[in-house]
Regions:
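Non-catalytic regulatory/linker segments of enzymes
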Residues: 1-151
Length: 151
């Protein structure tokens, strides 16, 4: 077995373990049956993406089930998602943790779509830009009330 195949096998084994640890072994099997070439390309292309996939197996499974891996997210998708996600975050820690994890999951999706030629460069950069804009808007909205009260 050559080094590339060993690397792919190691990465996919790492994913299988992560899915099994959160009781998603059957879902991992389904992913392997339906998108193994794409998972292989992801494993070859990005150690970071595999790391994030293994950190958030539920999120990746949900992206797959909902068809998010195969379709673009038109504006104002990220503004709407961040508004919902961050609405109940009342501490700096929870707010920052939530937005960081959301960004990591979005990056996993973008890398998956990019390395598998499932999106155009224009779609990818538009989504990246919108998430950046939405993140800035969310940070301003979160910070403005305490700042107004203070000053």
């Amino acid at each position: 077995m050559d080094l590339i195949q060993q690397h792919i096998n190691h990465q996919l084994s790492f994913c299988a373990t992560a899915f099994s640890q959160v009781n998603l072994a059957a879902e991992w099997h389904t992913l392997q049956l339906q998108i193994l070439p794409q998972l292989t390309q992801l494993a070859l292309s990005s150690d970071y993406a595999i790391k994030i996939l293994c950190q958030f197996p539920h999120a990746f499974w949900q992206m797959f089930e909902q068809g998010d891996l195969a379709q673009a997210h038109p504006r104002p998708y990220y503004h709407q998602q961040l508004t919902k996600l961050l609405a109940d975050k009342t501490t700096d820690f929870l707010w920052m943790q939530s937005i960081r994890q959301y960004r990591q999951q979005a990056m996993l999706r973008w890398i998956y779509r990019d390395v598998n030629n499932l999106c155009t460069l224009a779609e990818l950069t538009d989504e990246l830009s919108e998430l950046a804009d939405a993140s800035i808007d969310a940070a301003i909205a979160y910070a403005i009330k305490p700042l107004q009260a203070r000053y």
